[in-house]
């Protein structure tokens, strides 16, 4: 389950940013996760509940923005919503495509509490 290591990385980012801001805790954190990022949301949620205990994220609201995947055909340039990493272009039927959006996993923002 690589989701646990992802959550541990998010905790580290939150702790570093909280220290920089001279804050005590995080009120909310917003993540951006692409539909083709490879992250299993149920596993992320399970890992999240365990990993945030005793950290600055323990009482934080978790907001997740899902990003739909978009592919661009290398043959005809057509852009389309992708449901898998290897999907044919609906315009020319080529399988030579690039995923241009939807593989990301980012910490977009966090709000901190200075007591």
List PLM regions with ranges.
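Solvent-exposed beta-strand sheet faces enriched in polar/charged residues
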Residues: 29-32, 63-65, 108
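Compositionally biased, charge-rich low-complexity tracts
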Residues: 114-115
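Short functional micro-motifs and their immediate structural scaffolds
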Residues: 81, 94-98
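C-terminal binding/interaction regions
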Residues: 111
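Short, flexible, mixed-charge glycine/proline-rich loop motifs
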Residues: 61-68, 78-83
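Cys/His-enriched microdomains
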Residues: 71, 87, 105
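Short cysteine-rich clusters marking metal-coordination/redox-active sites
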Residues: 73-76, 89-92
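Long, charged N-terminal interaction/targeting segments
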Residues: 1-58
């Amino acid at each position: 389950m690589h989701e646990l290591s992802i959550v541990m990385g998010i905790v580290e980012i939150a702790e570093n940013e909280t220290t920089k801001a001279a804050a005590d805790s995080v009120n909310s954190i917003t993540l951006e996760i692409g539909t083709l990022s490879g992250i299993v949301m149920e596993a992320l949620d399970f890992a999240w509940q365990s990993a945030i205990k005793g950290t600055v994220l323990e009482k934080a609201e978790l907001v997740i923005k899902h990003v739909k995947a978009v592919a661009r055909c290398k043959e005809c340039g057509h852009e389309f919503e992708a449901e898998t990493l290897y999907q044919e272009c609906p315009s020319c039927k080529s399988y030579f495509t690039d995923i241009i959006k939807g593989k990301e996993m980012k910490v977009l923002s966090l709000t901190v509490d200075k007591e």
